[in-house]
């Protein structure tokens, strides 16, 4: 299960909280949410404090978002290591 919620939003920025497991179909849901935020020309950041696990597709999405300058905040050491080790 994955929960995505808006933590804060202004004219220029939006911060989403991502909680749970970023796996399977939930990866596409996060992709849709981040695309919607980016399409509004807002700076996007993700609070990953309560993200417990990512599969290889979730890790790939988070790496792609990082390359697009999406800030990833409060990432646990476990998730950080998964992002470094996981390959498709």
PLM segments and residue spans:
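STAS-like cytosolic regulatory interaction modules
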Residues: 1-88
